[in-house]
Every structure is written in C-alpha cells, then in structure tokens.
Amino acid sequence: MSDHAMTALITGAAGGIGRVLCAEFRRAGYRVIGTDMAGAPGIACDHFIEADLKAVSRDEACLKRFVQQLNIPASGLTALVNNAAVQILNRTDTVSVQDWRDTLDVNVLAPFLLTQALLPYLEKAGGSVVNMGSVHAIATKPGFVCYATSKAALVGLTRALAVDLGGRIRVNAINPAAVATPMLLQGFKGKDAQFSALGGMHPLGRIAEPAEIAQVVLFLVSRNAAFITGAAFDVDGGILSRLHDPD
C-alpha cells in the first residue's frame, strides 16, 4: 500500500471480533496493523505485532517500544480500534486485587495510553478512535463485577476524551451484545436450546454477527461520521430496551 493509504491499528486482532475487524478494514482499503498476545493463522493484517497490553500499560519503556514497532506511515494513523479485553468472572466475595488490576489495565488504561501515545499520528491523519465497550457497561449479571465496571469506565473514558480533545480527533464507542464468535459458538456446541434462548432474548430474535459489529466501527471512523464524537452506540439487537419480566 502507498504511504498515503488509510491505516488502522486494531488490538485484540486474534479474537473472533478482531479477526473480522481486520478483514473488513482491509476490504475497505485500509492498511491494517494488528496486535494481540500471540499471532494465529489467517489474520488479515498487513503488519502483526505480538504484545501483552498488561505489559504495555505497566511499563513506559514497553509502551515506547510498541509504538516504534507499529511503523506508522508518514501520513499518520486513520483509526485506532481498542478492541482487546479481558473478562475475569468472579463474584464479589472472591474478586481479588489482581483481578481488578488485570481487568482495568487492559480494558481501560491500555486504551487511554494508546490514544495518548498515538495522538500525534491520529491528528496528522484526521483520524479517530473507537473503543469496544459492551452492553455490560449498562446492564450486567452476576459474576461480571470487574468486567462490567471496566466497560462502564471505558464508555466514560470515551466521553471524557472526546470532550478533552475537542476537534483534534474524534473518540467514540460501541456496546455490542452477544456476538457469534467462534469462542461463543463453541461454548454452545450441543446446547441448541440454550443458544436459541439466547437469541430469543434479543427483540431481533438472534445474536450479532461479527461483521455487523465491524461495519459499525467502519462507519464511525469514516467521514460519514464526521460530526459524531463522544457517542456510545448500543449494537445490541434491542436487548437493552427489553424488560425480562416473567410472562
């Protein structure tokens, strides 16, 4: 690709949503830089970097090395998609301090530090940031104390950055509900009734496809969204609008 091509950095590139994000961004003409804990076959990246976001968020030297490894072109960075996350499930009486640190470092601090470190490149390209929130930022269930708190914080960070950075770059978030990733589908293997029930909880009658999430992200980083910043889009099939009272 030329030095003037659109460039996107996508974290969590090896995951179910991340892989599709990479593929859809490349299809849309972006040069894609992907990063994750470890590489895997079939990731549609032009450049892949193995990186532990816990280390990146805890060690300034590690963060600097990571940014150098990105090899961002002279034209700058068009899109930063903070997609990586950890989900540690524990009830209140068993959550540890380490659970909190691991969750907040990856899900909140890393998106902030990457936005901060890459701000000059994003400004140069007139770029924007999309943070991957979750419906758990708004409505959650038992066992998700750390995860739900971190996603609520990430949505709050999105709004705060949008206000603080003003017209320099745009910052938005999306809150997906259940998504048909390979990991989720494997978890429901042989459990057709439970999978059908999960889809039925959404007014649209199904869960999301990863490509549907990717298309919302692509819209938010496009010029068609030039007047949108500080927003959090619920890509949830209507589940947050529905009461689940017994019939």
Regions inferred by a protein language model and the residue ranges of each:
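Residue(s) in the substrate-gating loop at a strand-loop-helix junction
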Residues: 134
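Canonical Rossmann dinucleotide-binding motif of NAD(H)/NADP(H)-dependent dehydrogenases/reductases
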Residues: 2-33
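Active-site helix of classical SDR
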Residues: 115, 150, 158
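Short C-terminal tail/terminal secondary-structure segment
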Residues: 139, 229-247
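Alpha-helical segment proximal to the catalytic Tyr-Lys
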Residues: 120, 162-167, 226
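Substrate-binding pocket helix/loop in short-chain dehydrogenase/reductase
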Residues: 91-92, 96-101, 198
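C-terminal helical subdomain
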Residues: 173, 193-228, 235-237
